[in-house]
């Protein structure tokens, strides 16, 4: 993997983080009108249906250019398996996140971003090498998370968010495994259908929201479904093809910074001094993990 492709992947994932950051505000507003599981199920179906024409048009363009290669039965099986696995992990993570988002957009995002710790830890069990600078960046990220959240006793919504960060780490590693093997748009589409089916099935037992309530949070659903799901999660799958899961998770954890900024700009939530410092430290962690190792080695050679 070249430095150019790694940079490309990082930039795509930073854009993903921006889109996700704003989605915390939409989720926070949306769950005021309908149940968290209903919100997550509906937005997932919206994201899935939005991706169908994208997948079709992409294939038609390839056919027209003569670059289309019909997938084998094995590739289709891998795509379906990947979509189901990613969907189950994402369903668990995003549902827990939506259930805990009433902790506030900024706090929710930064607790969720603890997946930057779980990804390299889980990666060790998968025999993935993690550079020392990444562990330093992870520690910086944890310090940033502490500052942004402050000293607090865990509430139920915060427990939901910590659990969701664990499953987001599982989702990132699952995407890392399947994304190089299959079409990214199709993988994203299938995973959202899986999320929608699971959550909407649960919704039938918990209570179906009224049409009026769904319409009242229509704007939040549109952003969360089209932008956060269809666009951002597809960008995640594409971006992770060009970077390691640990570096990718650190780039995506910038969503916490953008969530705080979105809460400030859209909801008028004023940033406290410790929150600003925390944002800066998390951003520094993202930059650190992207610095090539060669820079430090060359500097040491010059000094000697």
Predicted regions, residues:
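Helix-helix packing/entry segments at the starts of transmembrane helices
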Residues: 42, 108-114, 175-196, 229-265
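C-terminal-most transmembrane helix of multi-pass membrane proteins
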Residues: 2, 44-45, 59, 217-219, ...
């Amino acid at each position: 993997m070249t430095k150019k492709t790694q940079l490309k992947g990082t930039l795509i994932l930073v854009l993903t983080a921006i889109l996700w950051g704003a989605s915390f505000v939409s989720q926070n507003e949306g769950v005021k009108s309908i149940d968290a599981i209903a919100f997550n199920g509906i937005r997932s179906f919206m994201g899935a249906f939005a991706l169908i024409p994208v997948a079709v048009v992409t294939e038609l363009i390839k056919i027209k250019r003569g670059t289309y290669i019909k997938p084998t039965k094995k590739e289709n099986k891998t795509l379906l398996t990947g979509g189901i696995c990613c969907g189950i992990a994402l369903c668990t993570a995003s549902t827990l996140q939506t259930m805990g988002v009433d902790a506030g957009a900024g706090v929710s995002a930064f607790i969720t971003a603890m997946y930057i710790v779980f990804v390299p830890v889980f990666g060790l069990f998968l025999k993935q090498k993690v550079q020392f600078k990444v562990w330093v960046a992870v520690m910086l990220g944890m310090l940033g998370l502490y500052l942004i959240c402050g000293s607090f006793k865990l509430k139920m919504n915060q427990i939901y968010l910590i659990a969701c960060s664990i499953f987001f780490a599982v989702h990132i590693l699952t995407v890392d495994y399947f994304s190089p093997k299959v079409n990214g748009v199709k993988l994203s589409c299938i995973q959202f259908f899986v999320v929608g089916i699971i959550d909407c099935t649960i919704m039938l037992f918990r209570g179906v929201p009224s049409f009026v309530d769904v319409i009242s949070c229509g704007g939040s659903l549109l952003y969360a479904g089209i932008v956060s799901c269809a666009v951002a999660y597809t960008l995640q799958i594409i971006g992770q093809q060009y970077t390691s899961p640990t570096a990718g998770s650190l780039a995506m954890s910038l969503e916490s910074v953008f969530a705080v900024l979105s809460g400030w700009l859209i909801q008028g939530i004023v940033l406290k001094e410790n929150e600003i410092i925390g944002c800066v430290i998390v951003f520094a962690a993202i930059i650190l993990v992207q610095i090539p190792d060669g820079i430090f080695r060359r500097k040491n050679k010059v000094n000697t």
